[in-house]
A protein has these predicted regions:
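Conserved lysine of the Walker
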Residues: 45
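Inter-motif core of Ras-like GTPase G domains
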Residues: 131-148
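The conserved Walker
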Residues: 41
């Protein structure tokens, strides 16, 4: 049996991180704070946003809604009269289980950044992949359901 060792000398996410920095620069120029909201599917990200988005006082929220396909969550949030941009990973992105910086970059032109103070990126429901990909956010938050608490080690 022949063995070959390959030495990785570059971070595989360098390209993603470069685009994430460009996203961050765009958000900073517009004065927009960005939260990347992550969780397992069905943990309650959308329900949490339905409850919180209307109680932000003078803060003008916007949502970038990530899903593999469909617009159910985006439709729920749009009913709150909050600007929502749907980003499906299935068409053109191969049905990815997360949003990456390039996907977010493709959605920036559809966002009215001048009308938003806080952009919440509701990432695709997945506990593994989203944490690996920076998208240009200021902060990340995790939503966990009660049944998942035994899986989380802090």
């Amino acid at each position: 049996m022949h063995r070959v060792k390959v030495r990785v000398v570059e971070d595989a996410l360098d390209a993603n991180n470069t685009i994430a920095r460009a996203n961050r620069d765009d958000f900073d120029r517009a004065g927009v704070r960005v939260l990347n909201l992550m969780s397992a599917p069905g943990s309650g990200k959308t329900s949490l946003l339905e409850r919180v988005l209307g109680d932000l006082g003078e803060v003008r929220p916007g949502v970038l809604e990530g899903d593999v396909q469909g617009s159910y969550d985006a439709d729920r949030l749009a009913s709150l009269h909050v600007p929502v941009t749907q980003l499906n990973t299935d068409p053109g992105f191969g049905g990815e289980c997360h949003l990456d910086a390039n996907m977010v970059r493709s959605a920036i032109p559809a966002l009215s950044l001048d009308d938003i103070d806080l952009l919440v990126i509701e990432n695709v429901g997945n506990l593994v992949c989203p944490a690996e990909f920076r998208v240009g956010e200021d902060a990340r938050a995790m939503v966990s359901s009660v049944t998942e608490l035994s899986l989380i080690h802090i």
